[in-house]
């Protein structure tokens, strides 16, 4: 197992010198930067004592304005003021155009198909806008900490895809930041509460911000968090609470529903102030123009109950997706300023049967957790500890799939500890067992990779091919010990094995395996594509053959059966050769000629399943 020391050779810190690293919560509405100082992780304030930086950027002809002043100017200068740029990260021009009126910007395209916002300074990409926010946070940190940063841990939503994560890294680099790691926001929140120090358990992260809601279910095993499920609502947040209160004011004050933008902002500000006051008070006097009224907490609860219920529905769905029960969730962490609302906390406590963790400011908890991780990755000593080393996986870890192919689960050079999971399914109807073959290497075929271990998952409930869901999880702890577990999500049956993945491999052998992967990359790709087409063809042939035996006589006439059989024979013959393209095309032809047959079988199955049942019985 290769060890990567954080400090560069010859640049190691002095025994009592700390290397400056920060955690950054790059949020949709607000952003923060935090650092570990005197053993405590805390957010860093600006010159005015404010720790929260609104994620707003306004472009002038000769300067860039970031933060509260830019946010205030958004209504007067909408085309040059960018809000919620996080929603655009990693997206294409087509994606952002689908958002329509939600984004009041003038978009222009480029050769890369990346959306550019037309401003007085010229076209600005989401990466550039995010970089301007990060630059302010970097400068704040270096000014407060009194030195240059060695790096930052930046948080991202758990559902961010590769392009969104890469865009975040690009923005950091443009802002002059070295990214030590991108950390999932729910994981950062759990770290802030020290939940990573527990042996194991299931944790829920309830994140209700100004404009979005996210729920994440994490499993902790051996100090490693695995994201089991995510969910939420991109159109649900504290802003909706404000709009509900504003509508109440309009109704109670008998105001016209047609309010100009300036009056609308004042109305929403009054609503937001009332909401915040009711966090501690049972009632509050609300003033808007000449109107005065009283809003009680009970009335507020009634106004926001539909929105709170929507968040709880997403929570239940996320927990159900993991295959666990609500009672198995051992801790619930509250994230986002909107979780200060008492009714939200009450509802979450009622759902999970335990009081949520709220001791840390919900606006700051993600940045605080990221700072703890950054301090560790920077190589700073813990009390009484030695210089921390960051371990990496030298070769990819994966498993065998049909056709003798290597499916990588954890890529090489991934830092540990780490846990990754993927879902697989059965290949044949009625399959009740699955062989798990764990491999190490960079090649596409298992014959060119190193076998680490084999084990079996037995007791899979018999069902049609592709219906079972088997989640295979790879976990490497801080000592480089690999644990692989397989769990059938429906029945809960599980099997696992442990192995030391680097055992028996010298540095020269690792180098040789890497060299071979580069040298034979082209041949490997061709071989993999051929195998994949052969596997797809074989799977289709077996499925069609089984369908013919079960329902061919009942649902097809003689001519239809003859056409299907001729296409099957043609595909079997092509599978004996090495023309992957021909196999692919014939597989498509067979699929096309059996489409009508498949539709008839589906209709027949649905009719049988719904016979004697009403709509209420089949709804959630």
From Swiss-Prot:
Keywords: ATP-binding, Chaperone, Nucleotide-binding. GO terms for molecular function: ATP binding; ATP hydrolysis activity; ATP-dependent protein folding chaperone; unfolded protein binding. It comes from the Bacteria. Belongs to the heat shock protein 70 family. The gene is hscA. Pfam families: HSP70. One of its GO terms (biological process) is iron-sulfur cluster assembly. Chaperone involved in the maturation of iron-sulfur cluster-containing proteins. Has a low intrinsic ATPase activity which is markedly stimulated by HscB. InterPro entries: ATPase_NBD, Heat_shock_70_CS, HscA_NBD, HSP70_C_sf, HSP70_peptide-bd_sf, Hsp_70_fam, ISC_FeS_clus_asmbl_HscA. This is Chaperone protein HscA homolog.
